[in-house]
Amino acid sequence: KEIVTPDIVGALYTGINTDTGGLSHNSSHPQTYRIIADLLEAGLDKAYIHERIYQMNNLSRLRLIGNVLLNKLEVNEQYPVAIMPITREELDRYNYKDGDLEGLVNIPLSVHNVCVSVQITERRERVKLSFRSKGNVPVNEWAKAFFNGGGHLNAAGGQMDLPLAEVVRKVKETIPWFFEQLKNSGI
């Protein structure tokens, strides 16, 4: 007999929801929705999970995100790319806790004509990169080619053991390569 508790149902739905961008990415398939239907039948409280994921913030998180969007967000003038470098000092200044940057990389995709967003975060041990895109733009290929990363078509990550400024420079230098690859592949 299967044992399914509310905690298990909630954890499964949370993973599905966050991995699919709230079911907005093309990685959401019919089977995903069938699984969610099963979770609903097992007692999933979808509204409770959504509130916990998307509508609960602490003040320091909001200030960190506000600082990044106001002072760090750069939109490339030649290519539809937004870049957000975030220093370790900024994380410390705003009392960063795991999860405080969750979803931030997606926000620049709402800017008109931006189809790729790259968040570059300086951690104590290395620099972490998060890539997001709209449509058929394979950011996983860019992450794999230059940033020791990978992922999916519209969501990828990478990491580098270099100073933040060097990683930002490398991202900017490889933007033309990435868009040339897109052009050559017919996307």
Predicted stretch roles:
Residues 1-15:
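A short, charged helix-loop
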Residues 13, 18-187:
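Hydrophobic helix-and-loop "lid/oligomerization" segment in the mid-to-C-terminal part
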